[in-house]
Every structure is written in C-alpha cells, then in structure tokens.
Amino acid sequence: MRKKIIWFGVLWLTALSLSRAQTETPTKKKEIQITWLGHAAFELVSSGGTDILIDPFLTKNPGTPAELKDLSHYHPNFILVTHSHGDHLGDAVELAKMSKAKIVSVYMPEPFKKGELPRELIEPANVGDHLTLGDVKVHVVPAMHSSEPSGRPVGFVVEFADGRSVYHEGDTWIFGDMALIQEFYHPNIILMPVGAAADGQSPRMAWIAVTRYFKPQVVIPMHYGALPGSSTEADLRAVFGNDPRVVFMKPGETKKF
C-alpha cells in the first residue's frame, strides 16, 4: 500500500511538471529598431515604442541625409547626450525644446544655459546611474575622452525589456574598465566609434577593444566617414575583415534586431 502511495505521488508530480512546462513559455526576443543618422547620432525604438535619440548632431552633420536634417521629423521621448562636444551635443537643446523630451546627460551648464533650456527638460546623470526611461533602462558608464566646455564624457548601455542591451560608447578610446561594462551589462549590440585618425579610437584600437573586452552579437561601426580626416569604410573592412558580427549601416538606414 505504501509503495502504491509513493508511486502515485511520483506520477502526480511528473504530470504537474509536464503541465507547467507546456504552459510556461520562455521570454521571446522583441524587436529593437536602430537607425543610424550619421556620425555618432542614432535613434533607438523599443518594442514598447520608447523613442530615444543619442548624440543628435544632425543639421550641421555632413553625414546626415538631407531629409533627416529637418528636426520636425523627430518625436523622441528622451535624448541622451554623451558629452558636450558639438558633434555629439549637436541639436539636442533645440530638439528638447521642440519635443519636450528630457535631455539625459552629465550636467553641462554652459550649453544648457546658452540654449535657455528649462530645468524640467534636463535629467542630470552621472557614471553609475541607472535610469528607467519608458520601457527601457539606461545605465551610465565611463568613457575615455574630453568634454569641452563642461561636463564629463560618458557612454550609455540601453537595456530593453527582453534583457538585451545596446551600448553606445560615445566618443572614447579603449580603456581597461570596458571589462567591467562587459561583466555588469553584457552588451549584445555595440555602437562603436572607429573613425579617429590622429587621436581617439582608430579602427585597430576599436577592434582590440571588441576582441579583448566584449562578447557582442553585433558591432555597428560609427563616428567615421562624416568629418574630414576620419576613417573610411574601406579602412574599417581592412581591419575587421569578414567578421559576421560587424554590421555596416548607411546614414539614414534602419535595422531591426
């Protein structure tokens, strides 16, 4: 009798386990939409519709297609700025005033005051901060660069609802703490500056960073081809070879991942 009870219990637990396995479904990957707007400017749109502009250097960007220089084209929920150099801050202040989207950045009093940006449109951030913006989380990480006239350079890891993340490096050179960014956030997609010639992160240094510190599924080169003296796509292909993780985008092109 005791053996029958035990076997009945085993069968019941097995049936319960199978029933749960059939009803529980794994988290499905959701679409991440990425548009390269030229240089370091990107638009990310989550599956929930959160629209984020990063480093929106547009109207004076020679790499931005003419039809995308019109700021009325954009309706961001948030604007992320990695530092105050003109080719990254770009049109952020004007876009914030037009769209009422908050600028998320290390506080930069000079450009913000000059643009007469209302305080409620500024979301000060610092290295180590974790911000919930719509249905995404944004982690603020270090960058190795300068930030005249004020502030400090940072990068952003944008984490989506399905757990995947996009790392916009900003403008940086390779640095050892990239290992911590990989350890903490495991970026799946890296938007990597590769266009420096005399200074900054060259294609070779960028590739060393990818192979030494990161394990991405996708690497999208940026910060090249627009400004005088920057690397060309041919320069990049000579270094990156035929690595299938590298996705070359054209300014204005949109891809879904």
Model-derived segments and spans:
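Active-site-proximal loop/helix segments of hydrolase catalytic cores
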Residues: 144-213
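Binuclear metal-ion centers of metallo-dependent hydrolases, dominated by the metallo-beta-lactamase
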Residues: 116-131, 208-257
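Beta-strand-turn-beta hairpins that frame and shape the catalytic cleft
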Residues: 26-32, 46-52, 130-139, 159-165, ...
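Active-site HxH/HxHxD metal-binding segment of metal-dependent hydrolases
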Residues: 67-131, 136-139
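Active-site neighborhood of phospho(di)ester-bond hydrolases with catalytic His/Asp-centered motifs
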Residues: 54-56, 76-84, 103-107, 166-170, ...
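Zn-dependent metallo-beta-lactamase
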Residues: 2-4, 11-51, 58, 242, ...
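Pre-active-site segment of Zn-dependent metallo-hydrolases
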Residues: 37, 46-85, 90-94, 146-148, ...
